Amino acid sequence: MYYLKPIGVVEQNENYTVLNIFDEFVEGLDGLKEGDYIIVLVWFHKNDSEEKRKILKVHPRGDINNPLKGVFATRSPYRPNPIGKYTVKIHKIYRNKIFIDKIDAYNETPIIDIKIFSEKLDCPKI
């Protein structure tokens, strides 16, 4: 059995998103700064049900005019493990809050990890 421990939650505001990091993990933010790009992994908790985890084919972007594809070939939130990934720029860090551009995660979406973006590691040469 695997166990994921959320490190914070998403807070949605009108024009931006805040990543609220739980106090016990704030020390892990040391070294991040304004202007850095980070990868944020979240748990799509509103799509987490046994039925939704069994969905393996979807119409991309929810458009029935798009042919069905396997979920691993899409960005669908319906997945066996409903993990979402965002690459975002840090606009400000204040205490336990990271201010970023607006993302489409729901308010209170659990944050399961943050990683610094590395062009060398995250942008394959094609």
Curated annotation (Swiss-Prot):
Keywords: S-adenosyl-L-methionine. Residues 4-126 form the TsaA-like domain. SUPFAM superfamilies: YaeB-like. S-adenosyl-L-methionine binds at residues 45-46, 75, 106-109. InterPro entries: TrmO-like_N (IPR023370), UPF0066_cons_site (IPR023368), YaeB-like (IPR040372), YaeB-like_sf (IPR036413), YaeB_N_sf (IPR036414). It holds the Pfam family TrmO_N. Transmembrane segments: none annotated. NCBIfam families: tRNA_TsaA. Belongs to the tRNA methyltransferase O family. This is Probable S-adenosyl-L-methionine-binding protein MJ1583.
